[in-house]
Amino acid sequence: MASQQQTVREWSGINTFAPATQTKLLELLGNLKQEDVNSLTILVMGKGGVGKSSTVNSIIGERVVSISPFQSEGPRPVMVSRSRAGFTLNIIDTPGLIEGGYINDMALNIIKSFLLDKTIDVLLYVDRLDAYRVDNLDKLVAKAITDSFGKGIWNKAIVALTHAQFSPPDGLPYDEFFSKRSEALLQVVRSGASLKKDAQASDIPVVLIENSGRCNKNDSDEKVLPNGIAWIPHLVQTITEVALNKSESIFVDKNLIDGPNPNQRGKLWIPLIFALQYLFLAKPIEALIRRDIATETKPAWETRDVGDRK
């Protein structure tokens, strides 16, 4: 959980939360420090228009990323850093990965370049709860993330579903709709990322988020979901658990971004190929030549020459 080269401001936005939420957040930050974790970097990714920037603003408690329903997302990633009680929180907001029904390779390359020499402690993969179905685009996004940062990034991942203050269709119970929506999305993510079901990476936690100012509140003035959960402390608690799991954080270096060099990879096989050629081709041919020489009948002129010399 490396430190990042970034202007770090005091996390004053935490004071805008309800006192009960502040207490829980400071307790969670204290738990991280007890584990010698003094900084945390969260990478926020997903399709466009799913609420990534709003989620960053909600976690920080400030309007740190500009958002507008009438404007497209910013073309470049933004890292916001805040410090509190000796702990530094870095959150990286990124542009959507889909453009015109395909992966936006330009946006993906910009994101990878931005992340060079940074460490990803948690991936927050954002989508919407009120999306009724999954499709091939979800699979493409999961594949693009995996191809860029490796399968290991899903060991440090959380799926976050926004627009959680949502009434399911046809009177379906809220928890049942959430369960079905979560499993459908996780199944596509596993498929796109080529994850095995029995692998740790398949056990990706799913959290609910409601960024609207109209979010309901409990008696402690905390923002709560229809299931009664105070979502900001629950999200930060899940982030803490993922950050402290046994999987390693992802350090983004040039080799990770560029992938294996096919030319260099081919060079590694050259000595083995030569050895096999010698064993299975050159050596047998050499033996055949020697045998032919040994059994070859000498021509008459060579025999005469030998007799004349005598």
Swiss-Prot record:
Entry keywords, A to Z: Chloroplast, GTP-binding, Hydrolase, Membrane, Nucleotide-binding, Plastid, Plastid outer membrane, Protein transport, Transmembrane, Transmembrane helix, Transport
Function, as annotated: GTPase involved in protein precursor import into chloroplasts. Seems to recognize chloroplast-destined precursor proteins and regulate their presentation to the translocation channel through GTP hydrolysis.
Record domain AIG1-type G: where: 37-260
Coiled-coil residue spans: none
Name of encoding gene: TOC34
Record region (G2): 72-76
Residues where GTP binds: G49, V50, G51, K52, S53, S54, E73, E210, N211
Chloroplast intermembrane side: 290-310
Keyword Transmembrane helix: yes
Any GO BP: intracellular protein transport
Renumbered residue ranges of the record's region G3: 93-96
Residue span of region G4: 162-165
Descriptive protein name: Translocase of chloroplast 34
Keyword Endoplasmic reticulum: no
Membrane topology, Cytoplasmic segments: 1-268
Root EC class: hydrolase
Quaternary organization: Homodimer and monomer. Part of the TOC core complex that includes a protein for the specific recognition of transit peptides surrounded by a ring composed of four proteins forming translocation channels, and four to five GTP-binding proteins providing energy. This core complex can interact with components of the TIC complex to form a larger import complex. Chloroplastic protein precursor such as prSS (precursor of the RuBisCO small subunit) interacts with these complexes.
Pfam families for this protein: AIG1 (PF04548)
Family: Belongs to the TRAFAC class TrmE-Era-EngA-EngB-Septin-like GTPase superfamily. AIG1/Toc34/Toc159-like paraseptin GTPase family. TOC34 subfamily.
GO CC, one annotated term: chloroplast outer membrane
Start and end residues of each stretch annotated as Homodimerization: 68-71, 128-133
Xref: SUPFAM superfamilies: P-loop containing nucleoside triphosphate hydrolases
GO molecular function terms noted in the UniProt entry: GTP binding; hydrolase activity; identical protein binding; protein-transporting ATPase activity
